[in-house]
């Protein structure tokens, strides 16, 4: 066979094989195409992802309604004597006063609350008849210099007690001043301290006396309702002192 013809046939054979190989690599053009991977859904430019879903939920604040407690109303002189005897077993006690309004020079005391352990407190209602007798029974306790006294904005309470003839002696702790010394830039009222240190929401005084021109005076509110407000204040203030020192 002519050598040139043989070379031509070999060339044509290689060309056909190459084309076949190329077609095999491409696959069948008429076969169903493999499904393409699903594309991610586009996010609109103005659509924001809520990152707070991944954050832990804020703990619900405690309150007098949700926290186990023992708040008692002292209604007689004998019950007051028993309360005083119990308080004397402790090295310190917290106290708070309630007045008709917030005018030190014209208001009248309505009651006092006392606490020596967290979540427990007494409320002692005071009227014009009982105040002199109760003040006489409480005088040795307030004048005892071996027992520390605790209050929130205690200067107000000291002045209220002075008006009914009670002098307060011994060590005194004011949680408002304590917090000012630790964190002078923050707020120091009871609601702020309760939220910050105890995750607790005190009862608002407006829930008892209202607000505005029709606001009541505290002596017009029932003793039970005042006790629900005043007793927790003493117990919470005691917890402030132990959290701050």
Question: Which ranges hold each PLM region?
Answer:
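Long, highly charged low-complexity segments
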Residues: 1-107, 112, 127-141
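Active-site-proximal helix-loop-helix substrate-binding element of RNase H-like nuclease domains
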Residues: 58, 62-71, 103, 107-245
């Amino acid at each position: 066979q002519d050598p040139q013809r043989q070379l031509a046939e070999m060339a044509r054979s290689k060309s056909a094989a190459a084309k076949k190989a190329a077609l095999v690599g491409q696959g069948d053009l008429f076969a169903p195409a493999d499904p393409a991977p699903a594309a991610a859904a586009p996010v609109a430019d103005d659509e924001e992802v809520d990152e707070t879903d991944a954050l832990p939920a804020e703990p619900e604040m405690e309150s007098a309604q949700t926290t186990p407690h023992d708040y008692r109303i002292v209604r007689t002189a004998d019950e007051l004597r028993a309360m005083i005897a119990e308080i004397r077993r402790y090295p310190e006690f917290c106290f708070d006063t309630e007045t008709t309004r917030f005018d030190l020079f014209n208001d009248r005391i309505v009651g006092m609350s006392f606490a020596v352990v967290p979540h427990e407190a007494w409320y002692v209602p005071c009227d014009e008849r009982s105040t002199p007798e109760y003040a006489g029974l409480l005088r040795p306790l307030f004048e005892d210099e071996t027992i520390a006294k605790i209050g929130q904005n205690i200067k107000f309470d000291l002045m209220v007690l002075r008006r009914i003839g009670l002098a307060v002696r011994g060590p005194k702790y004011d949680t408002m001043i304590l917090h000012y010394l630790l964190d002078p830039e923050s707020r120091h009222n009871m609601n702020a301290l309760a939220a910050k240190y105890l995750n607790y929401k005190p009862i608002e005084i407006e829930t008892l006396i209202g607000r505005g021109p029709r606001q009541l005076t505290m002596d017009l509110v029932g003793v039970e309702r005042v006790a629900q407000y005043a007793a927790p204040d003493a117990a919470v203030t005691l917890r402030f002192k132990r959290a701050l020192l």
